[in-house]
Amino acid sequence: MQDSSYKKQVTQAFDQSSSTYDRLGVEFFTPMGRRLVDISEPVTGERVLDIGCGRGACLFPAAEKVGSQGCVHGIDIAPGMIEEARKEATERGLRNISLMVMDAETPGFPARSFDLVMGSYSVIFLPDAVGALARYADILDHGGRIAFTSPVFRAGTFPFLPPEFTPLIPQALLEHLPEQWRPEALVRRFNSWLERAEDLVRTLEGCGYARLRQSTSRCG
């Protein structure tokens, strides 16, 4: 699948789900967004970029942390997500937030624009995630930092599902899955550099990052 076709599908999927995103069923992205903000520790006055901001799982907690002296910029490829986030920002009376439709793979900001770049379950959707990570390093100021979350990718299991669930999926369903959606293909397609901790460290160091820290959280 070509990157342009894939991105159109991603945009359409998130656009169509924007009105109910993380509002039906069990909450997931909202608590995980708060968790990411807690880990990344934005402080008063900082400039924050939230990539793939969705409806604001990270955006709003970060805005509270940086206060009126700071600012949080949210970007998302799906216009529907930006519209929903903008509505909520207005309802909350937040003036330290800006939102725009933008492809997170090629952020259009000058060098050293931000103190913190965050991405909650968004980096994994970028066809050239490693290239994007390198570009984020360029728009971070000296001493800036990046924080992002991802499901655990393991060969033979499905992303976003605990490994224990894989044996519960009917074999008949697995046999009829398109090749590109089988576990091994998903791991290859969605960033094999996330499969092992050492791969992640090596990738981030190659993009110019240092003093790396990892943590694992379970939701639910």
From Swiss-Prot:
Which EC main class describes this enzyme?
A: transferase
Task: Show the CDD domains listed in the entry.
Answer: AdoMet_MTases (cd02440)
* Protein family per UniProt: Belongs to the methyltransferase superfamily. DnrC family.
Q: In which pathway does it act?
A: Antibiotic biosynthesis; daunorubicin biosynthesis; Antibiotic biosynthesis; carminomycin biosynthesis; Antibiotic biosynthesis; rhodomycin biosynthesis; Antibiotic biosynthesis; aclacinomycin biosynthesis
Protein name as annotated: Aklanonic acid methyltransferase DauC
Quaternary structure annotation from Swiss-Prot or TrEMBL: Homodimer.
Gene3D superfamilies of this UniProt entry?
Vaccinia Virus protein VP39
Q: Which gene encodes it?
A: dauC
The answer to keyword Ion transport applying to this record is: no
Stated EC number for the protein is: 2.1.1.288
Alphabetically sorted, this entry's keywords are:
Antibiotic biosynthesis, Methyltransferase, S-adenosyl-L-methionine, Transferase
